[in-house]
A protein has these predicted regions:
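Glycine-rich beta-to-alpha active-site loop
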Residues: 91-125
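A short, glycine- and basic residue-enriched loop/turn
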Residues: 21-24, 58-59, 64, 109
Length: 125
C-alpha cells in the first residue's frame, strides 16, 4: 500500500500531498491521524517558510471523507465522536495552528473534509 500522506521538501517549502487518488483523495482515518502528525512536525521545523497542501493527481484536492468508514469507524455515536473530535479536529487544528504559512493548492474537487482542510489553510489557490 502506498503512503497516503506524502511529504516532499524543496528548500524552505514543504509539500504535503493527500495520496488516495483512486478515491479522489478521500481522507480516511489513518490519513487524518497522519496529517496531524506531519503538520505538527513541520510546524516546529525552523528551516521551513511555507507548507503547501495538495491532492495527488489532477482530479481532486480531496473529495471529503472516505464513505466506506461510515459503516465501520463511524457506525455508532461514540465512534463517530472519536473520529470527528479527535482525528478530524486534531488534523484540522494542526493545519490551522501551523507556525508557517499554509497554502491549499486546489485542483479539481474540493468538498467535505477536503474543503475543511483547505479552509484551515492560510491561503487557498
Amino acid at each position: 500500500m502506498a503512503e497516503e500522506i506524502l511529504v516532499a521538501r524543496d528548500g524552505v517549502v514543504a509539500t504535503v500531498t493527500l495520496n488516495n487518488p483512486a478515491k479522489l483523495n478521500a481522507v480516511n482515518a489513518s490519513m487524518w491521524r497522519r496529517l496531524r502528525t506531519v503538520m505538527e512536525e513541520l510546524s516546529v521545523d525552523d528551516s521551513l517558510r511555507c507548507v503547501v497542501l495538495r491532492g495527488a493527481g489532477e482530479a481532486a484536492f480531496a473529495a471529503g471523507g472516505d464513505l466506506e468508514e461510515f459503516l465501520t469507524l463511524r457506525d455508532t455515536l461514540e465512534r463517530a465522536l472519536v473520529y470527528h473530535e479527535e482525528w478530524v479536529a486534531g488534523a484540522l487544528n494542526a493545519v490551522r495552528n501551523c507556525l508557517h504559512p499554509t497554502v491549499a493548492l486546489i485542483h479539481g474537487a474540493c468538498i467535505g473534509g477536503g474543503l475543511e482542510i483547505a479552509g484551515a489553510c492560510d491561503l487557498r489557490i
